[in-house]
């Protein structure tokens, strides 16, 4: 991948991740995510964040094929991220599901592959061909006797095989990372977690900085479940810079050294969200935004299991 200006260097000192990308979680309509990817890439984005469990990587693959066929944007210009789902942690399944993702996308390699959550479920299919978990009589996923160490060792092999350039994790807390760093031959390049002004994650950020792990912020606007966009402090800062509140939040993240991956299917908003490289927030602006933290989570595992990972 060529190195665009607005990137963060990863801890291998070779690869760089663009500061802002397009999130692709939960496209409601067929074609919606593919159209969003095309708009984003043609508007300057070079970072697309996906996952097998989003069930739309074939659609993204078709969009990438169309864009590449036009000739102006090449595969090496794009930083594509995908994730290994919880029911695919067994050593025998990691490569299989990475290759399935590559097949769906029509790509030969991933720029970054993440363990989606620090929890393993048994696979519903004995041959492990699905992302669906085996469920108990209460409908809850059955936990698998698979350690993060076992899964991480297989992730490291994906780098050796040339299937992925970098590997990382998602939704890992400090304790998860401390354990991982004791045995990792390849350190995680990224930890992707929820970060926004109401959940600023200063302690996790400090730890990740200390060990060379870049944070990526998902749900930077709180998934629309809180009043970030109408917050008076954020609105006043946005007015001062003649920017949107979303622009201010994304800039606040980037100035903290955090990648952000806002999701939108609205073409105008996709373009507007990228408009963060022509202004700077002052120290006073940053302090005001930092003061909004209330440790409010909008994303928990409750939508797929009853395990309180963040308690």
Curated annotation (Swiss-Prot):
What terms describe the molecular function in GO for this protein?
A: aldose reductase (NADPH) activity
User: Domain of life here?
Assistant: Eukaryota
Claim: Protein biosynthesis is one of the keywords in the record: no
A Gene Ontology cellular component where this protein is annotated is: cytosol
User: Catalytic residues per the record?
Assistant: 54 (proton donor)
Q: Which residues bind NADP(+)?
A: 13-23, 219-273
| CDD domains named among the record's database cross-references | AKR_AKR1-5-like
- Any Pfam family from its record, for instance, is Aldo_ket_red
EC number(s) per UniProt? 1.1.1.21
| Residues the record lists as binding substrate | 116
Under which main EC class is this enzyme filed? oxidoreductase
Please write the reaction equations for the catalytic activity of this protein.
an alditol + NAD(+) = an aldose + NADH + H(+); an alditol + NADP(+) = an aldose + NADPH + H(+)
Entry keyword set = NADP, Oxidoreductase
NADP as a keyword? yes
Q: Which family does it belong to?
A: Belongs to the aldo/keto reductase family.
What is the stated purpose of this protein?
Catalyzes the NADPH-dependent reduction of a wide variety of carbonyl-containing compounds to their corresponding alcohols with a broad range of catalytic efficiencies.
Kindly give the PANTHER family that the UniProt entry links to this protein.
ALDO/KETO REDUCTASE (PTHR11732)
Provide the protein name: Aldose reductase B
Native organism: Dictyostelium discoideum (Social amoeba)
